[in-house]
Amino acid sequence: MKKKLLFLIMIMGVFIISGCGKTSESSVIKDLTKKINNAKSYYIEGTLEIVNNEDVYTYDVKVSYKEKDNYKVDLVNTTNNHEQIILRNKEGVYVVTPRINKSFKFQSDWPYNNSQVYLLGPLLEDIINDENRRFEKTDSGSKILVAASYPNNSKLVKQEILLDKNNNIKKVTVLDSNNVAQITMNFTKIDLGSKLKDSIFELKEIIDVKEERENTEKKDNTTNENKNTNENTNVNENKNTNENTNVNENKSTNESTKDKEDKTEETKQTSSIEDVIYPMYIPANTYLSNKEKVSKESGERLILTFDGDNPFMLIEETVTYEKEHLIVPTYGELEVMASTVAIVNDNSVNWIDNNIEYYVVSDKLSKSELLDIARSISVLPVSK
Protein backbone atom coordinates (compact mmCIF):
# COMPACT_ATOMS: atom_id res chain seq x y z
CA MET A 1 0.00 0.00 0.00
CA LYS A 2 2.84 2.34 0.90
CA LYS A 3 4.54 1.53 -2.40
CA LYS A 4 1.38 2.36 -4.36
CA LEU A 5 1.00 5.63 -2.45
CA LEU A 6 4.63 6.54 -3.11
CA PHE A 7 4.18 5.71 -6.79
CA LEU A 8 1.08 7.94 -7.03
CA ILE A 9 2.94 10.81 -5.34
CA MET A 10 5.79 10.46 -7.85
CA ILE A 11 3.36 10.49 -10.79
CA MET A 12 1.63 13.58 -9.44
CA GLY A 13 5.01 15.25 -8.99
CA VAL A 14 5.88 14.63 -12.63
CA PHE A 15 2.58 16.16 -13.76
CA ILE A 16 3.06 19.16 -11.48
CA ILE A 17 6.59 19.80 -12.76
CA SER A 18 5.48 19.34 -16.36
CA GLY A 19 2.52 21.63 -15.82
CA CYS A 20 4.72 24.31 -14.27
CA GLY A 21 6.98 24.21 -17.32
CA LYS A 22 4.07 24.75 -19.67
CA THR A 23 2.65 27.49 -17.49
CA SER A 24 6.04 29.19 -17.47
CA GLU A 25 6.28 29.16 -21.27
CA SER A 26 2.72 30.35 -21.75
CA SER A 27 3.08 33.08 -19.14
CA VAL A 28 6.30 34.38 -20.72
CA ILE A 29 4.76 34.49 -24.20
CA LYS A 30 1.55 35.99 -22.84
CA ASP A 31 3.49 38.75 -21.08
CA LEU A 32 5.67 39.43 -24.15
CA THR A 33 2.58 39.55 -26.37
CA LYS A 34 0.85 42.01 -24.06
CA LYS A 35 3.89 44.30 -23.93
CA ILE A 36 4.39 44.45 -27.69
CA ASN A 37 0.72 44.64 -28.68
CA ASN A 38 0.01 47.39 -26.15
CA ALA A 39 2.89 49.52 -27.39
CA LYS A 40 1.49 52.25 -29.63
CA SER A 41 5.06 53.17 -30.48
CA TYR A 42 8.58 52.09 -29.55
CA TYR A 43 12.23 53.04 -30.00
CA ILE A 44 15.12 50.56 -30.23
CA GLU A 45 18.91 50.78 -30.30
CA GLY A 46 21.34 47.93 -30.85
CA THR A 47 24.06 46.35 -32.94
CA LEU A 48 23.54 44.01 -35.87
CA GLU A 49 26.17 41.54 -37.07
CA ILE A 50 25.87 39.76 -40.43
CA VAL A 51 28.25 36.99 -41.51
CA ASN A 52 29.22 36.87 -45.19
CA ASN A 53 31.71 34.13 -46.11
CA GLU A 54 34.54 34.73 -43.59
CA ASP A 55 33.72 38.39 -42.96
CA VAL A 56 31.50 39.89 -40.27
CA TYR A 57 29.75 43.19 -41.00
CA THR A 58 28.55 45.27 -38.05
CA TYR A 59 25.80 47.89 -38.06
CA ASP A 60 24.64 50.39 -35.49
CA VAL A 61 20.84 50.10 -35.55
CA LYS A 62 18.14 52.57 -34.50
CA VAL A 63 14.49 51.64 -34.93
CA SER A 64 11.41 53.83 -34.54
CA TYR A 65 7.89 52.40 -34.79
CA LYS A 66 4.46 53.98 -34.49
CA GLU A 67 1.08 52.32 -34.97
CA LYS A 68 -0.54 52.22 -38.41
CA ASP A 69 2.55 50.73 -40.03
CA ASN A 70 5.07 53.52 -39.55
CA TYR A 71 8.63 52.21 -39.42
CA LYS A 72 12.04 53.86 -39.61
CA VAL A 73 15.19 51.72 -39.45
CA ASP A 74 18.54 53.52 -39.49
CA LEU A 75 21.48 51.24 -40.38
CA VAL A 76 25.06 52.54 -40.18
CA ASN A 77 27.92 50.27 -41.28
CA THR A 78 30.55 50.73 -38.55
CA THR A 79 33.44 50.00 -40.93
CA ASN A 80 32.86 52.66 -43.59
CA ASN A 81 30.10 54.74 -41.93
CA HIS A 82 27.80 53.98 -44.89
CA GLU A 83 24.26 54.87 -43.78
CA GLN A 84 20.97 53.67 -45.18
CA ILE A 85 17.47 54.20 -43.85
CA ILE A 86 14.50 51.90 -44.40
CA LEU A 87 11.30 53.92 -44.11
CA ARG A 88 7.70 52.78 -44.25
CA ASN A 89 4.78 55.21 -44.07
CA LYS A 90 1.37 55.64 -45.69
CA GLU A 91 3.03 56.58 -48.99
CA GLY A 92 5.05 53.39 -49.37
CA VAL A 93 8.45 51.91 -48.54
CA TYR A 94 11.71 53.77 -49.11
CA VAL A 95 15.38 52.86 -49.00
CA VAL A 96 17.19 56.15 -48.41
CA THR A 97 20.93 56.63 -49.01
CA PRO A 98 21.81 60.04 -47.51
CA ARG A 99 25.40 59.97 -48.77
CA ILE A 100 24.22 60.41 -52.37
CA ASN A 101 20.91 62.15 -51.55
CA LYS A 102 18.87 59.42 -53.25
CA SER A 103 15.90 57.19 -52.37
CA PHE A 104 14.32 54.13 -53.91
CA LYS A 105 10.56 53.99 -53.45
CA PHE A 106 8.45 50.89 -53.94
CA GLN A 107 5.23 49.20 -52.86
CA SER A 108 6.10 46.28 -50.63
CA ASP A 109 4.81 44.05 -47.83
CA TRP A 110 7.93 44.85 -45.80
CA PRO A 111 8.38 44.16 -42.95
CA TYR A 112 5.79 41.37 -43.01
CA ASN A 113 7.21 39.32 -45.89
CA ASN A 114 9.98 37.63 -43.86
CA SER A 115 11.57 37.47 -40.41
CA GLN A 116 13.01 40.70 -38.98
CA VAL A 117 15.55 40.48 -36.16
CA TYR A 118 15.23 44.13 -35.10
CA LEU A 119 11.43 44.60 -35.23
CA LEU A 120 9.28 43.47 -32.30
CA GLY A 121 6.02 42.76 -34.15
CA PRO A 122 7.47 40.33 -36.72
CA LEU A 123 9.52 38.62 -33.98
CA LEU A 124 6.38 38.07 -31.92
CA GLU A 125 4.56 36.68 -34.96
CA ASP A 126 7.39 34.17 -35.53
CA ILE A 127 7.09 33.02 -31.92
CA ILE A 128 3.30 32.70 -31.90
CA ASN A 129 3.02 31.04 -35.31
CA ASP A 130 5.58 28.29 -34.64
CA GLU A 131 3.72 25.41 -33.00
CA ASN A 132 7.01 23.47 -32.76
CA ARG A 133 8.90 26.19 -30.91
CA ARG A 134 11.21 25.17 -28.08
CA PHE A 135 11.23 27.00 -24.77
CA GLU A 136 13.93 26.85 -22.13
CA LYS A 137 14.45 28.63 -18.82
CA THR A 138 17.93 30.12 -18.35
CA ASP A 139 19.82 31.73 -15.46
CA SER A 140 19.23 35.18 -16.95
CA GLY A 141 15.66 34.63 -18.17
CA SER A 142 14.49 32.38 -20.98
CA LYS A 143 15.32 31.20 -24.49
CA ILE A 144 12.90 30.54 -27.34
CA LEU A 145 13.92 28.68 -30.50
CA VAL A 146 11.61 29.16 -33.50
CA ALA A 147 11.71 28.73 -37.26
CA ALA A 148 13.04 31.60 -39.36
CA SER A 149 11.39 32.77 -42.57
CA TYR A 150 13.80 34.10 -45.20
CA PRO A 151 12.38 33.16 -48.63
CA ASN A 152 15.43 34.52 -50.46
CA ASN A 153 17.98 32.77 -48.25
CA SER A 154 17.31 29.11 -47.53
CA LYS A 155 20.50 28.97 -45.45
CA LEU A 156 18.74 30.76 -42.59
CA VAL A 157 16.51 28.18 -40.92
CA LYS A 158 15.92 29.09 -37.27
CA GLN A 159 16.29 31.88 -34.75
CA GLU A 160 17.17 31.88 -31.08
CA ILE A 161 15.50 34.62 -29.04
CA LEU A 162 16.90 35.44 -25.59
CA LEU A 163 14.75 37.24 -23.01
CA ASP A 164 15.71 38.62 -19.60
CA LYS A 165 13.82 37.86 -16.39
CA ASN A 166 11.38 40.69 -17.14
CA ASN A 167 10.56 39.11 -20.52
CA ASN A 168 12.33 41.80 -22.55
CA ILE A 169 14.06 40.70 -25.75
CA LYS A 170 17.83 41.05 -25.36
CA LYS A 171 19.30 39.15 -28.30
CA VAL A 172 18.19 37.43 -31.50
CA THR A 173 20.47 35.02 -33.38
CA VAL A 174 19.60 33.57 -36.79
CA LEU A 175 21.21 30.16 -37.31
CA ASP A 176 21.91 27.89 -40.26
CA SER A 177 21.24 24.15 -40.30
CA ASN A 178 24.58 23.55 -38.53
CA ASN A 179 23.61 25.91 -35.69
CA VAL A 180 26.19 28.47 -36.84
CA ALA A 181 25.20 32.09 -36.23
CA GLN A 182 24.67 34.04 -39.47
CA ILE A 183 22.85 37.13 -38.14
CA THR A 184 22.99 38.48 -34.58
CA MET A 185 21.01 41.40 -33.17
CA ASN A 186 21.97 42.67 -29.70
CA PHE A 187 19.40 45.01 -28.16
CA THR A 188 20.93 47.74 -25.98
CA LYS A 189 17.74 49.78 -25.58
CA ILE A 190 14.02 49.08 -25.98
CA ASP A 191 11.65 51.91 -25.04
CA LEU A 192 8.05 50.75 -25.34
CA GLY A 193 6.72 54.06 -24.06
CA SER A 194 8.56 56.31 -26.46
CA LYS A 195 6.51 59.29 -27.66
CA LEU A 196 7.31 59.66 -31.36
CA LYS A 197 6.19 62.49 -33.60
CA ASP A 198 4.51 61.62 -36.90
CA SER A 199 7.03 63.83 -38.70
CA ILE A 200 9.97 61.49 -38.11
CA PHE A 201 8.33 59.02 -40.51
CA GLU A 202 8.20 61.58 -43.32
CA LEU A 203 10.83 61.42 -46.06
CA LYS A 204 11.13 65.21 -46.11
CA GLU A 205 12.00 65.25 -42.42
CA ILE A 206 14.84 62.77 -42.96
CA ILE A 207 16.24 64.75 -45.89
CA ASP A 208 15.98 68.09 -44.06
CA VAL A 209 17.68 66.73 -40.92
CA LYS A 210 20.60 65.33 -42.94
CA GLU A 211 21.08 68.55 -44.90
CA GLU A 212 20.86 70.67 -41.74
CA ARG A 213 23.49 68.49 -40.05
CA GLU A 214 25.87 68.80 -43.01
CA ASN A 215 25.43 72.58 -43.19
CA THR A 216 26.07 72.91 -39.45
CA GLU A 217 29.26 70.87 -39.74
CA LYS A 218 30.47 73.09 -42.60
CA LYS A 219 29.77 76.28 -40.61
CA ASP A 220 31.54 74.91 -37.54
CA ASN A 221 34.61 74.00 -39.60
CA THR A 222 34.70 77.46 -41.22
CA THR A 223 34.35 79.24 -37.85
CA ASN A 224 37.11 77.19 -36.25
CA GLU A 225 39.49 77.73 -39.15
CA ASN A 226 38.95 81.51 -39.15
CA LYS A 227 39.40 81.63 -35.36
CA ASN A 228 42.63 79.63 -35.44
CA THR A 229 44.04 81.74 -38.26
CA ASN A 230 43.34 85.01 -36.44
CA GLU A 231 44.77 83.76 -33.13
CA ASN A 232 48.00 82.54 -34.72
CA THR A 233 48.42 85.76 -36.67
CA ASN A 234 47.87 87.98 -33.60
CA VAL A 235 50.49 86.12 -31.57
CA ASN A 236 53.27 86.09 -34.17
CA GLU A 237 52.85 89.44 -35.96
CA ASN A 238 52.85 93.07 -34.80
CA LYS A 239 49.87 95.37 -35.17
CA ASN A 240 50.76 96.75 -38.61
CA THR A 241 51.70 93.37 -39.98
CA ASN A 242 48.62 91.94 -38.38
CA GLU A 243 46.32 94.23 -40.34
CA ASN A 244 47.84 93.12 -43.63
CA THR A 245 48.15 89.54 -42.54
CA ASN A 246 44.55 89.32 -41.39
CA VAL A 247 43.36 90.39 -44.82
CA ASN A 248 45.58 87.89 -46.59
CA GLU A 249 45.05 85.11 -44.09
CA ASN A 250 41.28 85.49 -44.11
CA LYS A 251 41.34 85.45 -47.89
CA SER A 252 43.51 82.33 -47.89
CA THR A 253 41.35 80.73 -45.23
CA ASN A 254 38.18 81.40 -47.17
CA GLU A 255 39.78 79.93 -50.29
CA SER A 256 41.01 76.96 -48.28
CA THR A 257 37.58 76.47 -46.76
CA LYS A 258 35.98 76.61 -50.19
CA ASP A 259 38.50 74.05 -51.46
CA LYS A 260 37.69 71.78 -48.53
CA GLU A 261 33.97 72.13 -49.17
CA ASP A 262 34.57 71.28 -52.82
CA LYS A 263 36.59 68.25 -51.74
CA THR A 264 33.77 67.26 -49.39
CA GLU A 265 31.41 67.26 -52.35
CA GLU A 266 33.92 65.17 -54.29
CA THR A 267 34.02 62.56 -51.54
CA LYS A 268 30.29 62.04 -51.98
CA GLN A 269 30.85 60.69 -55.45
CA THR A 270 33.34 58.48 -57.26
CA SER A 271 34.52 59.59 -60.67
CA SER A 272 36.06 56.35 -61.87
CA ILE A 273 36.38 52.64 -61.11
CA GLU A 274 40.00 51.67 -60.65
CA ASP A 275 39.62 47.96 -59.93
CA VAL A 276 37.25 45.47 -61.55
CA ILE A 277 35.23 43.65 -58.89
CA TYR A 278 34.38 40.06 -59.81
CA PRO A 279 31.83 37.85 -58.04
CA MET A 280 33.40 35.18 -55.84
CA TYR A 281 30.52 32.88 -56.74
CA ILE A 282 29.64 32.02 -60.35
CA PRO A 283 26.99 29.37 -61.20
CA ALA A 284 28.15 26.07 -62.69
CA ASN A 285 29.06 26.01 -66.39
CA THR A 286 29.07 29.81 -66.56
CA TYR A 287 32.01 31.99 -67.60
CA LEU A 288 33.01 35.61 -68.20
CA SER A 289 32.60 36.28 -71.93
CA ASN A 290 32.98 40.05 -72.16
CA LYS A 291 34.19 43.03 -70.15
CA GLU A 292 33.41 46.59 -71.22
CA LYS A 293 34.02 49.94 -69.56
CA VAL A 294 32.13 52.96 -70.87
CA SER A 295 32.10 56.62 -69.88
CA LYS A 296 28.92 58.30 -68.72
CA GLU A 297 28.12 61.92 -68.03
CA SER A 298 29.49 61.88 -64.49
CA GLY A 299 31.69 58.81 -64.17
CA GLU A 300 32.09 55.31 -65.54
CA ARG A 301 30.07 52.16 -66.08
CA LEU A 302 31.59 48.67 -66.12
CA ILE A 303 29.64 45.83 -67.77
CA LEU A 304 30.64 42.21 -67.17
CA THR A 305 28.79 39.63 -69.27
CA PHE A 306 28.71 35.99 -68.19
CA ASP A 307 27.54 33.31 -70.64
CA GLY A 308 26.89 29.59 -70.36
CA ASP A 309 24.16 27.53 -68.73
CA ASN A 310 23.31 30.30 -66.24
CA PRO A 311 23.97 33.62 -68.01
CA PHE A 312 23.87 36.96 -66.19
CA MET A 313 25.29 40.48 -66.31
CA LEU A 314 27.09 42.35 -63.55
CA ILE A 315 27.03 46.13 -63.91
CA GLU A 316 29.13 48.43 -61.73
CA GLU A 317 28.84 52.18 -62.06
CA THR A 318 29.90 55.29 -60.19
CA VAL A 319 27.23 57.26 -58.37
CA THR A 320 26.83 61.01 -58.10
CA TYR A 321 25.66 63.09 -55.17
CA GLU A 322 22.31 64.60 -56.16
CA LYS A 323 21.93 68.33 -55.42
CA GLU A 324 18.15 67.85 -55.25
CA HIS A 325 16.92 64.72 -53.48
CA LEU A 326 16.16 62.08 -56.12
CA ILE A 327 13.34 59.55 -55.63
CA VAL A 328 13.50 56.52 -57.95
CA PRO A 329 10.25 54.49 -58.24
CA THR A 330 11.24 50.83 -58.09
CA TYR A 331 9.53 47.47 -58.40
CA GLY A 332 10.69 44.81 -55.97
CA GLU A 333 11.39 44.13 -52.32
CA LEU A 334 14.26 45.01 -50.01
CA GLU A 335 16.89 42.61 -48.70
CA VAL A 336 19.46 43.42 -46.02
CA MET A 337 22.74 41.97 -47.27
CA ALA A 338 26.07 41.91 -45.43
CA SER A 339 27.23 45.44 -46.18
CA THR A 340 24.15 47.21 -47.54
CA VAL A 341 20.42 47.12 -48.31
CA ALA A 342 19.53 45.73 -51.73
CA ILE A 343 16.45 45.96 -53.95
CA VAL A 344 15.39 42.57 -55.33
CA ASN A 345 12.91 41.75 -58.09
CA ASP A 346 12.32 38.80 -60.41
CA ASN A 347 15.21 39.60 -62.75
CA SER A 348 17.72 41.72 -60.84
CA VAL A 349 19.40 42.74 -57.60
CA ASN A 350 20.45 46.37 -57.18
CA TRP A 351 22.44 48.00 -54.36
CA ILE A 352 24.84 50.84 -53.54
CA ASP A 353 28.06 50.32 -51.62
CA ASN A 354 31.16 52.52 -51.24
CA ASN A 355 29.84 55.01 -53.83
CA ILE A 356 29.45 52.27 -56.45
CA GLU A 357 26.03 51.10 -57.67
CA TYR A 358 25.77 47.42 -58.57
CA TYR A 359 23.26 45.48 -60.67
CA VAL A 360 23.11 41.70 -61.11
CA VAL A 361 20.69 41.01 -63.97
CA SER A 362 19.42 37.75 -65.50
CA ASP A 363 16.22 36.38 -67.02
CA LYS A 364 17.37 32.81 -66.34
CA LEU A 365 18.29 32.83 -62.65
CA SER A 366 15.98 32.79 -59.62
CA LYS A 367 15.95 35.50 -56.95
CA SER A 368 17.91 33.21 -54.65
CA GLU A 369 20.59 32.60 -57.29
CA LEU A 370 20.84 36.32 -58.10
CA LEU A 371 21.32 37.04 -54.40
CA ASP A 372 23.99 34.35 -54.08
CA ILE A 373 26.00 36.19 -56.74
CA ALA A 374 25.31 39.57 -55.14
CA ARG A 375 26.38 38.40 -51.68
CA SER A 376 29.65 37.08 -53.10
CA ILE A 377 30.67 40.58 -54.22
CA SER A 378 32.14 41.51 -50.86
CA VAL A 379 35.40 43.17 -51.87
CA LEU A 380 35.20 46.96 -51.75
CA PRO A 381 36.47 48.66 -54.92
CA VAL A 382 39.29 51.19 -54.83
CA SER A 383 38.06 54.53 -56.13
CA LYS A 384 39.79 57.75 -57.04
Predicted regions, residues:
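Short, solvent-exposed recognition patches
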Residues: 74, 223, 251-354
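N-terminal leader/targeting segments and the immediate start of mature chains
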Residues: 2-5, 9-70, 228, 238, ...
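Flexible, processing/modification-adjacent segments and terminal tails
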Residues: 90-153, 157
